[in-house]
Design a protein with these regions (language model features):
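Auxiliary Fe-S-binding modules of radical SAM enzymes
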Residues: 1-88, 262-267, 271-341
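N-terminal [4Fe-4S]-dependent radical SAM core
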Residues: 42-122, 130, 134-141, 167
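Generic domain-boundary/flexible-linker signal
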Residues: 86-89, 131, 140-143, 190, ...
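Extended interfacial segments that mediate partner engagement and assembly in macromolecular machines
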Residues: 102-127, 133-166, 174-177, 182-187, ...
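A local structural micro-motif
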Residues: 140, 207, 338-341
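Pocket-edge positions in alpha/beta enzyme catalytic cores
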Residues: 144, 246, 317-320
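Conserved AdoMet/S-adenosylmethionine-binding subsite of the radical SAM
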Residues: 151-314
Length: 341
C-alpha cells in the first residue's frame, strides 16, 4: 500500500499538525443552542463542510456537545436506539446512566504505533459478547468511579509527551502519545467525552477504540474530533454477531460505520480470530477490508481465550489453535493488507 496509514497521526506527534478536536474548538459557528434539534443538526452538518473561521460566536465543539446531550433525552447513541431517557436517570440497554471510569493508565500493550497510550476504560458496553475478556467492566455499568470532565482533562494534559525531554519520549511509563477512549465501549459516554475535550488544551491525538455499533448521528459528532479510529471488526456475518454478541443487523451497521469513519480519520482495524470462525468470520472480514478500506492498518489478533460465558458455546470453548491464527494471517497477507506487528 502506498503511503503511511497513520501519517496525519504522526504529524501531530511530531508537532507538525494539530489534533482534530483542537481545530474543532477553534471553528466558530453562529448558533442559538435553544433552537430545536433539527435546526441544530442542520447547522452542524453545514459546518462540517465549511472551513474554520474566527468571528464572534460559539465553538463547533460546543454545538457537538449540545447535540450529544440532547441524544440522551431518548438515547440513540448506539444502534440499539433504545430511546431511554438517560438525561433523567433512566437505564437503557447498556445500563449506563452516568459516566463511570473503571480504570485509566498508560497502556503499553496496544499496537506499536499507539504505545504508550493513555487508555481510559469506561464501564458498560453496547454489546453482550459471550466471550468478553473484560466482562467485569462491560457487564457492570455502575462500577468504577465518577470524575468531572475538568478532572479528566487535567489528567490528560499531565500525560502529554511534549512535556518530557525527547530522550524520555519512547516507551516512558509517565507520558502518552494519544488518548485512547475505550470500555466496554465508549459510545454510551460520548457526551461526557466531548465535555472533557472542551476542557482540554493538549495537542494530543484522540483514539476511538470501539465495536463501531454507534449510530450515524454519533459518528457525525466524532467527525472533527477523532484522529484515529481503532475499530473492532468481530464478525463476518449477522448470524454469528447475533448469536455471540446479541448485535442485530451487525454487518450493515459496522460496514457503514467503517466506511464513514475512514473518510473522517485514519484507522487501525482489529480482528480477533475466534476458534472455529476463520471461514465464516475472518475470511469475509479481511476480504471486505481489502475491497472497501484504503490505507488502513490491520491487526489480526490471536489473544482469544475462553472467558465469561464462552463455555456455553461449544466451538469457542477452547483456546485458539495456532493453525487457525496462521490461516487468518495467511489470508490477510494474500490480500496485501498492511498488518500490525
Amino acid at each position: 500500500m502506498l503511503g503511511h496509514a497513520l501519517s496525519n497521526y504522526y504529524r501531530i506527534l511530531d508537532g507538525e499538525d494539530t489534533a482534530k478536536y483542537l481545530r474543532t474548538k477553534e471553528h466558530i459557528v453562529t448558533v442559538d443552542l435553544s433552537d430545536n434539534e433539527h435546526e441544530l443538526w442542520s447547522l452542524h452538518d453545514s459546518a462540517l463542510l465549511r472551513e474554520a473561521h474566527t468571528v464572534e460566536g460559539m465553538s463547533f465543539l460546543d454545538l457537538k456537545m449540545e447535540l450529544a446531550h440532547r441524544m440522551l433525552d431518548r438515547c440513540n447513541l448506539c444502534e440499539r436506539r433504545c430511546g431511554a431517557k438517560r438525561s433523567a436517570g433512566e437505564k437503557g440497554h447498556c445500563g449506563v446512566i452516568e459516566p463511570r471510569i473503571s480504570s485509566e493508565f498508560i497502556h503499553m500493550g496496544e499496537e506499536p504505533d499507539l504505545v504508550p497510550s493513555y487508555t481510559i476504560f469506561f464501564s458498560g458496553c453496547t454489546f453482550e459478547c459471550v466471550f468478553c475478556q473484560n466482562w467485569d467492566i462491560s457487564t457492570k455499568p455502575t462500577s468504577g468511579i465518577q470524575m468531572s470532565a475538568d478532572m479528566v482533562a487535567r489528567m490528560i494534559e499531565d500525560k502529554v509527551a511534549s512535556k518530557y525531554p525527547s530522550n524520555q519520549r519512547l516507551r516512558n511509563a509517565h507520558f502518552a502519545r494519544n488518548v485512547n477512549w475505550v470500555g466496554g465501549d465508549p459510545t454510551s459516554n460520548l457526551p461526557f467525552i466531548l465535555e472533557v475535550l472542551r476542557e482540554c488544551s493538549a495537542n494530543i491525538p484522540q483514539v476511538w477504540n470501539s465495536n463501531m455499533y454507534l449510530t450515524e448521528e454519533s459518528l457525525k459528532l466524532l467527525d472533527g474530533v477523532i484522529d484515529v479510529y481503532l475499530t473492532d471488526f468481530k464478525y463476518g456475518n449477522d448470524k454469528c454477531a447475533l448469536r455471540l454478541s446479541n448485535a442485530p443487523d451487525y454487518m450493515r451497521i459496522v460496514e457503514r460505520n467503517h466506511r464513514l469513519a475512514r473518510v473522517q480519520a485514519e484507522m487501525i482495524v482489529r480482528h480477533l480470530v475466534l476458534p472455529g470462525h476463520v471461514e465464516c468470520c475472518s475470511r469475509p472480514i479481511l476480504n471486505w477490508i481489502a475491497k472497501n478500506l484504503s490505507h488502513v492498518k490491520v491487526n489480526v489478533m490471536a489473544q482469544y481465550r475462553p472467558a465469561h460465558r464462552a463455555k456455553g458455546f461449544k466451538e469457542i470453548d477452547r483456546p485458539l489453535a495456532m493453525s487457525e491464527y496462521s490461516r487468518a494471517v495467511e489470508i490477510a497477507n494474500g490480500l496485501g493488507l498492511d498488518l500490525c506487528y
